[in-house]
């Protein structure tokens, strides 16, 4: 399985660490130059972020960094479809666990049935689906945090692309909103990677967020309730991992 590591070209320290830890284990990979949202999106993607929806229902538009992060994953979903084979997508702030190679060898078997497999720790509740190669395959009830590591099949990538005509949330929230995409979010335990989060945010960076008007706070909370209900209904229907 091809491994792509999303990384800004200028992220010398991060790239050096990735090269060091993966080379030491004889693992082939390829850096994928991340889109720097602070320098603008590729022209064909510029109209996709829906700032008005974001402001109305989530209080603020996507930050330039969030747009760049979404664009980077979007382009790799296109690459997955082009290759017509599952790929492993990693962000450059990860470290491999002792189980990395085992998980990597198991992923093709998981993709015989499932389109998306998270390979990093995830918070929240989950349901056990099955055991593959002595690993536990989980169905995550809430997969709205982090995109440091996951594998995606061409069909799964097509789902994400088909529902990315408008970018209405950050990419990790989008992937986690299974009711929107129809993507069943599974994950393997033990995990292949973890993020020490010791280098701060690079692709996204931090920007000063403006104070949210009271009216938008109300619509934000109403929308949050809507999402909770939709995800609850989705989980009730799909907790067995079946589409």
Write out the residue ranges for each language-model feature.
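An acidic/histidine-cluster motif and surrounding catalytic segment
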Residues: 1-90, 94-243
């Amino acid at each position: 399985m091809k491994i792509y590591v999303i990384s800004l070209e200028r992220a010398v320290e991060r790239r050096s660490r990735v090269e060091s830890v993966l080379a030491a284990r004889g693992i082939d990979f390829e850096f994928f130059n991340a889109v720097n949202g602070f320098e603008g999106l590729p022209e064909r993607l510029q109209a996709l972020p829906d700032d008005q929806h974001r402001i109305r229902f989530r209080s603020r538009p996507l930050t330039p960094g969030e747009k760049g992060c979404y664009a980077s994953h979007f382009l790799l979903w296109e690459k997955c479809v082009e290759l017509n084979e599952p790929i492993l997508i990693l962000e450059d702030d990860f470290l491999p666990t002792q189980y990395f190679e085992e998980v990597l060898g198991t992923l093709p078997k998981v993709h015989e049935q499932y389109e998306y497999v998270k390979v990093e720790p995830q918070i929240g509740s989950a349901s056990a689906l099955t055991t593959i190669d002595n690993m536990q395959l989980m169905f995550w009830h809430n997969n709205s945090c982090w995109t440091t590591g996951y594998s995606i099949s061409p069909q799964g990538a097509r789902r994400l692309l088909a529902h990315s005509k408008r970018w209405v949330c950050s990419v990790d929230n989008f992937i986690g909103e299974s009711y929107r995409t129809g993507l069943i979010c599974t994950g393997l335990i033990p995990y292949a990677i973890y993020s020490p989060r010791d280098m701060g945010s690079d692709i996204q960076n931090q920007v000063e967020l403006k104070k949210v008007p009271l009216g938008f706070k109300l619509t934000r909370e109403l929308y949050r309730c809507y999402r909770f209900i939709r995800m609850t209904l989705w989980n009730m229907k799909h907790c067995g991992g079946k589409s």
